[in-house]
């Protein structure tokens, strides 16, 4: 059934209804005032592209795409969206959407205005802030228009910015689907956004931004909103900052129109103290329901507050970074501009002023991007920029959200940045204080408080997962991880100009080895002398097929169960030997902190043969660590036999272990809801693996996504795991979880004495 009502869904339905849909359902169940609506679920989009035969055409266009080529990215995006919008919707799907809209209208006895919003299955999730990549259509009325906008939302899964973000975040296009939320519109007199805790520091301070009319003016950065800061500890309004709201967006004749506001209205306070307190109360209820700080969208109509969206805040820093830079007081230069410090950090560089996405090619690596307000299409330039400064916007505008996610300093709402700052000027941007200084300013290091910033020491090592060698130095510095528990080299291999075997067939094996060595060295050097476990290539055939020379890759019904991991390594022995030679070059240079990790092991014979090849290539296994991943029930159940072949460590790959144990394809939205790393069967295999490792003196670790989940990590520590490897943004949080779990275990033992 393609349509699900919001009242019938909850957080467990994310694979079906996406982040937005699931969150709205959760709010309704918590009795939060949310406008009624329904979701066209993600299975329907899949059914649409499969039934109409357009799926292969879409994904083939994406496989060959270089997302850094802006012009080609735009062209491919346009072509895909045109294919979707011009393809006729299957009759049964269209009929159900029309019937659901009619039912929504029955309560009021007339056609109602609705908002039609995309709800991507990777959007609004706790570990990825996708900053509004997909589209929202407001003031939609009538069955025909609803059907049309649903198709446009499907197409918005392939906007340039959405495609670009997925590649940057490591999401495969085929793995991300899209649901569409159709929800009654609130004809808001006032609206805005509320962070239930500070979006950067995490302090118990509620930040509310408000405008007259529709809230789209805030997120788009079209106006500078009022900002209210409410101290949740002292229970009082701490700060009121009135923004200059030159116009408002409102509904007129079924369209969103821009209405100029007279100066007295533009500078009028939007919210009363009473309204602020009511919003804070609702925000606290929502935060308590989810158990974590929330980014909440709200609207007021006829004096009643409605919550139209809530998502987790993904940008809170767990602690101030060690040696975080600040502008030296002695060296503070002339202040050119002041605004809101929207994303912390200090950066100096040359100014590049742009006024539209057509000019983003002007912005080079290390420039200071200055604009009226960023748009999602400017993200490639934002990624290159050292810092971002805007005329307009508040703490929840596009520039602020994306800058925090990218880790780029930003100052927003300066009002006159594009007039004061000129191309070529050298400035320093302080994203903490919200100040832009003239010239390149000397920086000072923040003294490290002896107690407040004391490092957390744990017996269980906390390592980090790395996919992109270019970020290794920064990740090593910022996380202070105990090493790399998973270095996925297939990501860098898939980024080469041709298939690994084509290098070999073309007689360029030495060049291929050198390319591997150079990229591996970036990671091994950044973390030296801490261990770096390099996983040999584990990409499925469908990813290799898109490369030049990959035409001979087998076409498999389910590549995740096919020719990958150790199977490919041993079948394409020349390629595996090349990997071993690249690692040997590192060892010969003195980088004995490397470890070799074999993926998808199912038998001792695979380990034995891999070791024979490594030794024959001169790899000194007495100097480095050699281990395996436990990703299959087979490996977990015969681990004793695998250990006999001589290994130093075992790492649990819980992503695959979970789906192989439960017979669930985690990328299939029809069954993804069954995917559960804490299923008793999965936990028994994990516990068994750790126990067997302890009995045989072999190190145990985890590098799957579950290693970034606090509730799973607590169990791993209880089981006695030696190390946990988490995603970079989760390392500090996991370190805290590990420390708490270890303390609890010690206390429990003491109580028994």
From Swiss-Prot:
<feature type="binding site">
    <location>
        <position position="535"/>
    </location>
    <ligand>
        <name>substrate</name>
    </ligand>
</feature>
<feature type="binding site">
    <location>
        <position position="488"/>
    </location>
    <ligand>
        <name>substrate</name>
    </ligand>
</feature>
<dbReference type="InterPro" id="IPR006319">
    <property type="entry name" value="PEP_synth"/>
</dbReference>
<keyword id="KW-0808">Transferase</keyword>
<comment type="pathway">
    <text>Carbohydrate biosynthesis; gluconeogenesis.</text>
</comment>
<dbReference type="InterPro" id="IPR013815">
    <property type="entry name" value="ATP_grasp_subdomain_1"/>
</dbReference>
<dbReference type="InterPro" id="IPR015813">
    <property type="entry name" value="Pyrv/PenolPyrv_kinase-like_dom"/>
</dbReference>
<feature type="active site" description="Proton donor">
    <location>
        <position position="703"/>
    </location>
</feature>
<dbReference type="GO" id="GO:0006094">
    <property type="term" value="P:gluconeogenesis"/>
</dbReference>
<keyword id="KW-0479">Metal-binding</keyword>
<feature type="binding site">
    <location>
        <position position="655"/>
    </location>
    <ligand>
        <name>substrate</name>
    </ligand>
</feature>
<feature type="binding site">
    <location>
        <position position="654"/>
    </location>
    <ligand>
        <name>substrate</name>
    </ligand>
</feature>
<feature type="binding site">
    <location>
        <position position="656"/>
    </location>
    <ligand>
        <name>substrate</name>
    </ligand>
</feature>
<comment type="similarity">
    <text>Belongs to the PEP-utilizing enzyme family.</text>
</comment>
<dbReference type="Pfam" id="PF01326">
    <property type="entry name" value="PPDK_N"/>
</dbReference>
<dbReference type="Pfam" id="PF02896">
    <property type="entry name" value="PEP-utilizers_C"/>
</dbReference>
<dbReference type="GO" id="GO:0005524">
    <property type="term" value="F:ATP binding"/>
</dbReference>
<comment type="function">
    <text>Catalyzes the phosphorylation of pyruvate to phosphoenolpyruvate.</text>
</comment>
<dbReference type="InterPro" id="IPR000121">
    <property type="entry name" value="PEP_util_C"/>
</dbReference>
<dbReference type="InterPro" id="IPR023151">
    <property type="entry name" value="PEP_util_CS"/>
</dbReference>
<protein>
    <recommendedName>
        <fullName>Probable phosphoenolpyruvate synthase</fullName>
        <ecNumber>2.7.9.2</ecNumber>
    </recommendedName>
</protein>
<dbReference type="InterPro" id="IPR002192">
    <property type="entry name" value="PPDK_AMP/ATP-bd"/>
</dbReference>
<dbReference type="GO" id="GO:0008986">
    <property type="term" value="F:pyruvate, water dikinase activity"/>
</dbReference>
<dbReference type="InterPro" id="IPR036637">
    <property type="entry name" value="Phosphohistidine_dom_sf"/>
</dbReference>
<dbReference type="Pfam" id="PF00391">
    <property type="entry name" value="PEP-utilizers"/>
</dbReference>
<dbReference type="InterPro" id="IPR018274">
    <property type="entry name" value="PEP_util_AS"/>
</dbReference>
<keyword id="KW-0547">Nucleotide-binding</keyword>
<keyword id="KW-0460">Magnesium</keyword>
<feature type="binding site">
    <location>
        <position position="631"/>
    </location>
    <ligand>
        <name>Mg(2+)</name>
    </ligand>
</feature>
<keyword id="KW-0067">ATP-binding</keyword>
<feature type="binding site">
    <location>
        <position position="653"/>
    </location>
    <ligand>
        <name>substrate</name>
    </ligand>
</feature>
<keyword id="KW-0418">Kinase</keyword>
<dbReference type="GO" id="GO:0046872">
    <property type="term" value="F:metal ion binding"/>
</dbReference>
<dbReference type="InterPro" id="IPR040442">
    <property type="entry name" value="Pyrv_kinase-like_dom_sf"/>
</dbReference>
<feature type="binding site">
    <location>
        <position position="656"/>
    </location>
    <ligand>
        <name>Mg(2+)</name>
    </ligand>
</feature>
<feature type="binding site">
    <location>
        <position position="631"/>
    </location>
    <ligand>
        <name>substrate</name>
    </ligand>
</feature>
<dbReference type="InterPro" id="IPR008279">
    <property type="entry name" value="PEP-util_enz_mobile_dom"/>
</dbReference>
<feature type="active site" description="Tele-phosphohistidine intermediate">
    <location>
        <position position="398"/>
    </location>
</feature>
């Amino acid at each position: 059934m393609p349509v699900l009502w919001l009242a019938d869904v909850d957080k467990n339905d994310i694979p079906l209804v996406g982040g937005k849909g699931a969150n709205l359902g959760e709010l309704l169940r918590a009795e939060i005032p949310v406008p009624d609506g329904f979701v066209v679920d993600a299975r329907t989009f899949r059914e649409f592209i499969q039934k109409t035969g357009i799926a292969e055409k879409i994904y083939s266009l994406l496989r060959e795409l270089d997302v850094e080529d802006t012009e080609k990215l735009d062209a491919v995006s346009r072509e895909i969206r045109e294919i979707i919008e011009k393809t006729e919707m299957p009759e049964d799907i269209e009929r159900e959407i029309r019937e659901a809209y009619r039912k929504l209208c029955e309560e009021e006895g007339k056609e109602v205005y609705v908002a039609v919003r995309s709800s991507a299955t990777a959007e609004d999730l706790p570990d990825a802030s996708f900053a509004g990549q997909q589209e929202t259509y407001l003031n939609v009325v009538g069955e025909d228009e609803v059907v049309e906008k649903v198709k446009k939302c499907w197409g918005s899964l392939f906007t340039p910015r959405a495609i670009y973000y997925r590649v940057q975040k490591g999401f495969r296009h085929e793995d991300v689907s899209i649901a569409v939320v159709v929800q009654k519109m609130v004809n808001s007199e006032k609206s805005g956004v509320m962070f239930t805790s500070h979006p950067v520091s995490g302090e118990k301070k509620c930040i509310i931004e408000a405008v007259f009319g529709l809230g789209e003016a805030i997120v788009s950065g079209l106006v500078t909103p009022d900002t209210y800061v409410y101290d949740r500890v002292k229970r009082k309004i701490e700060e009121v900052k009135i923004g200059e709201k030159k116009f408002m967006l409102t509904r007129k004749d079924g369209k969103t129109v821009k209405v100029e506001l007279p100066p007295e209205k533009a500078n009028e306070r939007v919210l009363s103290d009473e309204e602020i307190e009511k919003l804070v109360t609702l925000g606290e209820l929502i935060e308590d329901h989810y158990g974590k700080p929330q980014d909440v969208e709200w609207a007021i109509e006829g004096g009643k507050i409605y919550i139209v969206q809530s998502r987790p805040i993904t940008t809170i820093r767990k602690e101030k970074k060690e040696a975080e830079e600040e502008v030296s007081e002695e060296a503070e230069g002339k202040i050119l501009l002041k605004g809101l410090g929207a994303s912390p950090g200090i950066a100096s560089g040359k100014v590049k002023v742009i006024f539209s996405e057509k000019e983003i090619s002007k912005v080079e690596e290390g420039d200071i991007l200055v604009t009226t307000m960023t748009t999602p299409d400017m993200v490639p330039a934002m990624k290159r920029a050292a810092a971002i400064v805007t005329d307009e916007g508040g703490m929840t505008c596009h520039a602020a959200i994306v800058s925090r996610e990218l880790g780029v300093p930003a100052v927003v709402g300066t009002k006159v940045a594009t007039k004061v700052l000129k191309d070529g000027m050298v400035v320093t941007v302080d994203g903490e204080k919200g100040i832009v200084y003239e010239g390149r300013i000397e920086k000072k290091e923040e003294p490290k408080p002896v107690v407040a910033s004391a490092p957390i020491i744990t017996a269980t090592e906390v390592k980090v997962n790395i996919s992109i060698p270019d970020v290794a130095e920064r990740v090593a510095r910022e996380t202070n991880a105990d090493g790399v528990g998973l270095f996925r080299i297939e990501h860098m291999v898939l980024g080469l100009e041709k298939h690994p075997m084509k290098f070999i067939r073309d007689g360029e094996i030495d060049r291929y080895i050198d390319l591997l060595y150079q990229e591996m060295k970036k990671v091994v050097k950044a973390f030296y002398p801490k261990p770096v476990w390099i996983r040999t290539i584990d990409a499925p055939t469908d990813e290799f097929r898109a490369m030049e020379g990959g035409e001979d890759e087998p076409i498999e019904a389910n590549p995740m169960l096919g020719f990958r991991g150790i199977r490919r390594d041993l079948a394409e022995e020349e390629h595996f030997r090349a990997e071993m030679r690249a690692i040997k070059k590192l060892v010969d240079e003195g980088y004995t902190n490397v470890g070799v990790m074999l993926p998808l092991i199912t038998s001792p014979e695979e380990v034995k043969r891999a070791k024979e090849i490594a030794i024959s290539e001169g790899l000194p296994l007495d100097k480095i660590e050699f281990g395996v991943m436990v990703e299959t029930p087979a490996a977990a159940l015969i681990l004793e036999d695998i250990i006999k072949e001589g290994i130093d460590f075992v790492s649990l790959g819980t992503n695959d272990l979970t789906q192989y144990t439960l017979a669930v394809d985690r990328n299939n939205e029809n069954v993804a809801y069954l995917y559960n790393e804490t299923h008793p069967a999965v936990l028994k295999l994990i516990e068994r693996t750790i126990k067997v490792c302890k009995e045989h003196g072999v190190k145990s670790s985890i590098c799957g996504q579950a290693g970034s989940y606090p509730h799973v990590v607590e169990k791993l520590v209880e089981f006695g795991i030696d190390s946990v490897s988490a995603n970079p943004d989760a390392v500090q949080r996991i370190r805290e979880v590990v420390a708490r779990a270890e303390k609890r275990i010690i206390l429990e033992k003491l109580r028994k004495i």
